[in-house]
Curated annotation (Swiss-Prot):
Highest taxon listed in the record's lineage: Eukaryota
SUPFAM superfamilies registered for this protein in UniProt: UBA-like (SSF46934)
Record-given protein name: Defective in cullin neddylation protein 1
Function of the molecule: May contribute to neddylation of cullin components of SCF-type E3 ubiquitin ligase complexes. Neddylation of cullins play an essential role in the regulation of SCF-type complexes activity.
Encoding gene, per UniProt annotation: DCN1
Keywords: Ubl conjugation pathway
Keyword Metal-binding (UniProt): no
Organism: Candida albicans (strain SC5314 / ATCC MYA-2876) (Yeast)
GO annotations of cellular component type: ubiquitin ligase complex
């Protein structure tokens, strides 16, 4: 059975349509199964409401071989830190690049340096990436989509549901994922302050750059924003003001909104800041810090 025949068969099984319909949608996207299914449900949203029998997807042997190359010697159902570093190297990705976080989000990594067999195999099977080259090319596109906040890719756990319930992945999803991904244990509730700062140094410039590009803002504006970011880091490491050594998920996720809705709108005066709004205490303390040093 040819690969195109297999893809048509999978399309028919997943959508309950005819071979003719499958061929039409697959040919329009050069036999990219994921895009073909998305396009079908975009044009026929009512079809997504039909309850379909779960389909057991056969995993391509090439994917199994790739996973087995990197799997942990003590636990064959996961890739651990050593295998992950080798995998990233083969993909041409450095661990400190934003692409490594995008890959972790894509493959639903439970924590830093770990990929599970089930997610690795099923997600790459869904996207029809069966070799390192295809995976590398896909990650480049996926990361670009996230960084530019386009939302062109969906959480694959939702794509077979009602189209209105399908969840597009955007940069905020990557940002929030980073917190939980960085925790060392499942029971851990707070992120070490130094770790939080390192990830903010990676993520905040991307938010600034995207906002500046979308709103055609100049270098002077970006310099004002970057100055506020540096003041945020200085505040966090000032033991007189910041007695906590960790960041809660609420503080992490709300700072994203504070940065987009307050800092990026007016980095000089914070004109939209409302001290009566439900910001986490660390944000209120940051504003107090700025006032004390006559920085605001």
């Amino acid at each position: 059975m040819s690969s195109k025949t297999q893809l048509r068969q999978q399309f028919c099984e997943l959508t309950g349509t005819s071979n003719t319909t499958a061929t039409k949608y697959l040919e329009s996207v050069r036999y990219d199964l994921a895009r073909a299914i998305d396009n079908y449900y975009n044009k026929h949203p009512n079809k997504a409401q039909v309850t379909k029998k779960p389909v057991k997807v056969k995993i391509d042997d090439r994917l199994i071989q790739i996973f087995d190359k990197y799997k942990d010697s003590e636990d064959p159902n996961k890739i651990d830190i050593e295998g992950t570093l080798t995998y990233l190297g083969d993909l041409g990705i450095s661990p400190d690049q934003i692409e490594s976080l995008s890959l972790a989000l894509l493959l639903k990594s439970p924590k830093t340096g770990v990929f599970t067999r089930e997610n690795f195999l099923h997600i790459w099977q869904y996207y029809q990436c069966f070799d390192i080259g295809a995976m590398s090319e896909f990650i480049t596109r996926f990361n670009k989509d996230l960084v530019n906040n386009i939302g062109g890719f969906k959480d694959i756990s939702t794509v077979s549901d009602d189209e209105n319930k399908s969840v597009p992945l955007k940069f905020q999803d990557l940002y929030n994922f980073t917190f939980k991904f960085s925790l060392e244990t499942e029971s851990q509730k707070f992120l070490d302050l130094d770790t939080a700062i390192e990830y903010w140094k990676l993520l905040l410039p991307i938010i600034t750059e995207t906002y500046s590009k979308d709103n055609k803002l100049d270098e002077e504006f970006k310099n004002h924003v970057n100055e506020r970011v540096e003041q945020w880091f200085k505040f966090l490491t000032d033991t007189e003001y910041m007695t906590k050594k960790s960041i809660s998920y609420d503080s992490w996720s709300m700072f994203y909104l504070f940065f987009k809705e307050i800092v990026l709108i007016d980095p000089i005066k914070f004109k939209d800041y409302d001290e009566m709004a439900a910001w986490p205490s660390v944000v209120d303390e940051f504003l107090e810090y700025l006032h004390d040093f006559e920085l605001l």
